[in-house]
Amino acid sequence: MPRTADDSWDIATSVGATAVMVALARAAETASETPLIRDQFAEPLVSTPELAAVREQVAAWWAQTDDDDDPDFTVDSQQMTDYLAVRTHFFDSYFIDAVAAGIRQVVILAAGLDSRAYRLDWPGGTMVYEIDLPKVLDYKEHTLARHGAAPVAALRAVPVDLRHDWPQALRDAGFQTSLPTAWLAEGLLPFLPAAAQHALFTAIDANSATGSRVAVEMFGVDEDARRAAEERAQRWARQRAKRQARGQDTSFDPFDLWFDDEGQPDPADWFAAHGWTTDSVQVGAEALRLGRTATSQEGPFVNRFVTAGKP
């Protein structure tokens, strides 16, 4: 279903279902022989009866079959599990470094089924704010409570749409603009239109004290990247049509939910232009550093992880 400017969802629909996909990958990685990450909460979060249909839809999207005539392009479960394991490991390390430097205020934007408040070794006095839609946050809180899980850090849910006045909602929840903050925008940007991305970065900057940090998963926004994305979209459309003709389920596809309007900011350039010290890591290089072969240089491994600090 096409996105609209003010659409909404729960954990089993639209953008919410993509959080299920991510948690499924974290669960698979955790259960593997040599996991990069350990997320013991991912499996219980995705194993509930109400997510049965989503699990089937994601499995169909991930399936790699001999009938696919463009195998180098096909998304498969191992590729996505590897990518999301590398991504999770990188941003886990980002938070570990941030609190080691003395930061005790954390904001996770579009938190979805993120369980870092429950599984990372947070120092005493750390406050974690999770922002997402109310139904998504409610599902996570109630599911983990049924399993007896308790957050390691102090945790405050901020139920608000990131296209609305989320900074005010964050401050109303107790966020202190005078304290340095570690911000995270993981897997978020494509689900926001360009104007909302600019507004997001502006709000982060305006609400960040000296010593704050931000980490962003960066998807291609330059002209070459946009052309490559358009080519991938055309290839996937052809592949998808053939799957549909064979009677396969193609109802789940995160790319259906992405905004592709022009003017999306490059986070590294944006924060550098606003006085932050920035760095970026190409995901394929990070995967190789961690011993994971980047299975496709055309897939998500071409993304970048951007980090920045406010002097």
UniProtKB/Swiss-Prot annotation:
Q: In which residues is S-adenosyl-L-methionine bound?
A: D132, D161, L162
What EC number is given for this enzyme? 2.1.1.-
- This protein's record includes keyword Transport: no
Q: Which GO terms describe its molecular function?
A: methyltransferase activity
BP terms from Gene Ontology? methylation
A Pfam short name: LCM
- Asked if the keyword GTP-binding belongs to this entry, the reply reads no
- Keywords tagged on the record: Methyltransferase, S-adenosyl-L-methionine, Transferase
Family as reported in the entry's similarity comment: Belongs to the UPF0677 family.
Q: What role does this protein play? A: Exhibits S-adenosyl-L-methionine-dependent methyltransferase activity.
Q: Which protein, by its recorded name, is this?
A: Putative S-adenosyl-L-methionine-dependent methyltransferase MUL_4761
